[in-house]
């Protein structure tokens, strides 16, 4: 799993070489998913990530992905997803239609990593091999419940320039 997490970090900061994977971090709460996502946000920088959830990959909301290298949907619900075609296209590096609110409509190939965290993997109508081969499901099995929270991890360490450069 550690090697896979390093590969995900590489994909987040080098999105032009897409591996065609949609990353889903799974596991019960308080296990490090959010901390890992915060580290990635700090690695790519403030203006380079978006925060859409899978059910928002449609309509005007797609415009918020333009120019980003990473999308992180944190703590997504286990709701049924009737439509995942835009997610599949973005993951593969294929063109999608961007419809700017009060603006133009155009086709664009987005180069970004889509990552979501969830307690359970969301269900979808799509049961094709094309959907399943794009999924990269990473289990987070740690359990930090009952342990004293080290607030410095998120407030200091994950923002430390030297640490981020090392990563």
What residue ranges belong to the model's regions?
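Segments of Walker-type
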Residues: 1-3, 47-51, 65-66, 109, ...
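P-loop NTPase catalytic core of nucleic-acid-dependent motor ATPases
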Residues: 1-69, 136-138
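Conserved catalytic/switch belt of AAA+ P-loop NTPases
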Residues: 13-14, 41-45, 84-106
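Alpha-helical scaffold elements adjacent to nucleotide-binding pockets in ATP/GTP-utilizing enzyme cores
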Residues: 36-39, 68, 82-90, 97, ...
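AAA+/SF3 P-loop NTPase mechanochemical coupling elements
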Residues: 60-67, 99-117
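Conserved AAA+/SF3 P-loop NTPase catalytic/coupling segment centered on the Walker-B
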Residues: 69-92, 106-110, 124-131
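Conserved nucleotide-binding/hydrolysis micro-motifs of P-loop NTPases
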Residues: 77-78, 119-123, 141-146
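Phosphate-sensing "switch" segment of ASCE/P-loop ATPases
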Residues: 108-111, 127-167
